[in-house]
């Protein structure tokens, strides 16, 4: 991640094609050790690629990763729509029409540990 961030900073700073030395200078300026091999690998992998395309590809990959809870579609209007639905529900002892209560499950902390990828590779 640090090599990618340094590469992007070098590009934002006006360097058209950042080199390993640019990455090393940026990282050392903030007190971060730079491994020359990893910097070279990062520069080689990013050479000739459009940064915006890389960001969009990353967003697509992140959207495919499950983060636990499944998103629930909420109609526009949110709570007022729920109140309207409750008002339109049949009154009386008709328990068959009543929606089942949702049980909240406590998620273990381990579910956050593995998101399907390592951000530090």
From Swiss-Prot:
Residues 72-121 are annotated as: Disordered. Coiled coil: none annotated. Phosphorylated. The keyword Transcription does not apply. Residues 72-99 have a biased composition (Low complexity). Transmembrane segments: none annotated. Keywords: Phosphoprotein, Ribonucleoprotein, Ribosomal protein. One of its GO terms (cellular component) is cytosolic large ribosomal subunit. GO terms for biological process: cytoplasmic translational elongation. InterPro entries: P1/P2_N_sf, Ribosomal_P1/P2, Ribosomal_P2. One of its GO terms (molecular function) is structural constituent of ribosome. HAMAP family: Ribosomal_L12_arch. P1 and P2 exist as dimers at the large ribosomal subunit. PANTHER family: 60S ACIDIC RIBOSOMAL PROTEIN FAMILY MEMBER (PTHR21141), LARGE RIBOSOMAL SUBUNIT PROTEIN P2 (PTHR21141:SF5). Belongs to the eukaryotic ribosomal protein P1/P2 family. Plays an important role in the elongation step of protein synthesis. This is Large ribosomal subunit protein P2.
